[in-house]
Every structure is written in C-alpha cells, then in structure tokens.
Curated annotation (Swiss-Prot):
Alphabetical UniProt keywords: Cytoplasm, Lipopolysaccharide biosynthesis, Transferase
Organism listed in the record: Neisseria meningitidis serogroup A / serotype 4A (strain DSM 15465 / Z2491)
Gene3D superfamilies named among the record's database cross-references: Aldolase class I
Annotated pathway: Carbohydrate biosynthesis; 3-deoxy-D-manno-octulosonate biosynthesis; 3-deoxy-D-manno-octulosonate from D-ribulose 5-phosphate: step 2/3; Bacterial outer membrane biogenesis; lipopolysaccharide biosynthesis
Entry GO CC: cytoplasm
Protein name: 2-dehydro-3-deoxyphosphooctonate aldolase
Protein's UniProt keywords contain Cytoplasm: yes
Gene giving rise to this polypeptide: kdsA
Enzyme class: transferase
UniProt record similarity statement: Belongs to the KdsA family.
Length: 280
C-alpha cells in the first residue's frame, strides 16, 4: 500500500524516502542551516526528502534536560522551513490538544513510541486526516503493531506509516530485529515501513540521565535494515553532535550526510531493481 505525502509517494517497493533533520529544534538559524544542507544533498542525489524535528521532547529522563522551543515557536519555525524550501515536514505530538494545530502546519504527524497505545491521542491524531507515522514501541513485538493500526482504521484514518526504532534487549540496550520489518509488512497490510536508525542506536548509561549512543555503527545498521526493501529511512544529524541538546551520541555528523546517503541509495537501488522473490 502506497501513501501520498504532497508530491511524494511512499511505498515499500518504491525508491526510499528520507525523513531527516534534527532531534529537537534548537533555534531558527540552526534549523534552517541544517535543513538547507539536507535539501542540497537530497536534491543532488535525487532522494525524496521530508524534514523532521521535534518542537518538544516531552519524555526526557531529567526534568532539567532541554525540551525544545515549544509548540507555538516550533510551528513558526516549521512554517519558515516549508516557505523557504518547499518540502514536507514531520513532527511528533504528545497530547491530544496539540494534534489540530500541528496538522495545520505539518504534513505528517508522528505518534511517539512510548505513547503508541494511548487511545485518546490516537483518536485525536486520526481526526486530523493527516498522514501518521507510528513509532513501534520498544516493548512491542512487530506483529502487535496491527492493534495500533486497527485503532486508526476504526477512527477512519488509514494513511499510516510504520516505523521501527529498536526493541528493548535486557536493561539499557536496544537491538533491531531485522526479521521484524517483514512481519510488520505482512501483518499490517503492507503499509509503508521506515527505519529510524539513529534512535535504534541509543544506549543508557547506569547512573546517567542522558542517553548514550553508537553512531559509529549507524551505516552498518542502516544498510542492514534497508536491505529488507523499506519505504524510507529516518535519520537525525547535527552540525556538531557533541553540542547537540538531545541525543548527540546517536546523531550523524552533518558533514557525513552525503557520503552516508550515497551508500544507502546504492543499496536501495540495487534491491529494488530486482523482482520480489517469494520463498514459501
């Protein structure tokens, strides 16, 4: 099943779409500079592109951690991104009252993994009629995503994307079950599946409120996931990850974006140049 996002068509058998940007909005200038680089690289490589960022990181481990610029300022920044670059935007919501104002500006609304079973939030998101990106919770099996999908269908919104972001593996660690991509496709009507590689690289350090990360393994993990014929890749970057206000250890250094995407596109082109081989 393919999904339209403005002039972009997203599907598991189509050339991959990049959902890329920064973890959280830090300022207007840094957002526009980062987005400009993404736009330049993706246009050069011929990759459909959707900008992503959060206006509020409502689930930070510490109450003292940076959360973002807030809803009102965030929507102003997203409007400027769309006006300057003419690209779609995706952001996440955390409470039902945020859904409609976000839907008026952003093209895709994201359901956070930790909130994916919250029925009131699902219903409010569905009512907007926007395309919805469902993050798979770390505690949920791929096949159980069908229950979340069914909630959206019951609320009359079938414009859905499924997003893998890793599964809990014991304490303080995430792993990605590569077989899970196929399971989500099979159990959820072949909805577009995308891979959030940078969040899948998160770790937790004992005694620390901040997330660690393994960005050195980002390319290996991204290639492994994209080899399963996915609709898109979800990627966060930062001009200087050491200075990022959230999830810097998992962020791809922005200057490596082009070389990173060249390799992803080469694999995606190869995989999708071949007919699907069904093994029963």
């Amino acid at each position: 099943m393919d999904i339209k996002i403005n002039d972009i068509t997203l599907g598991n058998n189509l050339p991959f779409v990049l959902f890329g940007g920064i973890n959280v909005l830090e300022s207007l200038d840094s957002t526009l500079q980062t987005c400009a680089h993404y736009v330049e690289v993706t246009r050069k490589l011929g990759i459909p592109y959707i900008f992503k960022a959060s206006f509020d990181k409502a689930n930070r481990s510490s109450i003292h951690s940076y959360r973002g610029v807030g809803l009102e300022e965030g929507l102003k920044i997203f409007e400027k991104v769309k006006a300057e670059f003419g690209i779609p935007v995706i952001t996440d919501v955390h409470e039902p009252h945020q859904c409609q104002p976000v839907a008026e500006v952003c093209d895709v609304i994201q359901l956070p993994a930790f909130l994916a079973r919250q029925t009131d939030l699902v219903a409010a998101m569905a009512e907007t009629g926007n395309v919805i990106n469902i993050k798979k919770p770390q505690f949920l099996s791929p096949s159980q995503m069908k229950n979340i999908v069914e909630k959206f269908h019951e609320a009359d919104n079938g414009k859905l994307i499924l997003c893998e972001r890793g599964s809990s593996f014991g304490y303080d660690n995430l792993v990605v079950d590569i077989l899970g991509f196929g399971v989500m496709k099979q159990t959820c009507g072949n909805l577009p599946v995308i891979f959030d590689v940078t969040h899948s690289l998160q770790t937790r350090d004992a005694g620390s409120a901040a997330s660690g990360g393994r960005r050195a393994q980002a390319l290996d993990l991204a290639l492994a996931g994209m080899a399963t014929r996915l609709a898109g890749l979800f990627l966060e970057s930062h001009p200087d990850p050491k200075l990022a206000k959230c999830d810097g250890p998992s962020a791809l250094p922005l200057h490596l974006l082009e070389d990173f995407l060249i390799r992803i596109k080469a694999l995606d082109d190869l995989i999708k140049s071949q007919p699907i081989l069904t093994i029963e």
